[in-house]
């Protein structure tokens, strides 16, 4: 007697979100990238179509970041020039996206003006042809000014702008609507707040296919299991037809992995941990691969060797296991 293999088919799928815009679409990108569209749990090709592979955005900053030497070494020749830094990420390290973090805008730091921030975004747009993710410094008032100006200056480029949070989502949502960009909806590892924020943004008439969820992750050893659980619930909600949980997910892997002491502490202090030149790279790569299994669509990363390892893993995971 033939054995019937049961498959758990879903009645819905993750929303597709298009990043970037070509010249014909009103932008200047060489191509667009589509994320989302999954009709099954992560890489369950046997249960539904996984139409778009996860992508990696490499981080570029508008100031010299306070990173450990092992992380700065691949970029020492370009770290003072965001445009050249972005070019190196794309041309040498194969970044799918550029993740431009405007930390220089921080009033407690370099306090770059709005005009300086806009100039940096334009510099990076001119330097590379891939789509951009642009986020502010984290200061609510300054980000309000900076991101509105960036949205206007890059109108038509279909950027992914962030971060919109429950207490300050209105101005960025309005800017994304007017200037035709996508938005990152960030919530603090709380699925109820995540869903509510998506509802609030959508009620302002920004389409669901212009929203990407940042659930706030923890790095390896620092809450990643809770992040994994929240992301699983988001994916299950999407597959069960919950439109307000159906957006693609973005994860700040590099930031969370490299802030862990275990990633960058010198071997002289912790000889049993192994060389920091290898340890930090593995910390970032393993954080990323774990989050892929939870349903990440966009990984924001830092070290090129970690990026290479994760790209190889994505290649393997995208080979169909359908039967």
Curated annotation (Swiss-Prot):
Binding annotation for 5-methoxybenzimidazolylcob(I)amide: 188
Keywords: Carbon dioxide fixation, Cobalamin, Cobalt
Molecular function GO labels: cobalamin binding
Example of a GO biological process term: carbon fixation
Keyword Oxidoreductase: no
PANTHER family from the UniProt entry: ACETYL-COA DECARBONYLASE_SYNTHASE COMPLEX SUBUNIT DELTA (PTHR36214:SF5), PTHR36214
Protein task: Acts as a methyl group carrier in the anaerobic acetyl-CoA pathway (Wood-Ljungdahl pathway) of carbon monoxide and carbon dioxide fixation.
Subunit structure: Heterohexamer composed of 2 subunits of AcsC, 2 subunits of AcsD and 2 subunits of AcsE.
Stated name of the protein: Corrinoid/iron-sulfur protein small subunit
The organism of origin for this protein: Moorella thermoacetica (Clostridium thermoaceticum)
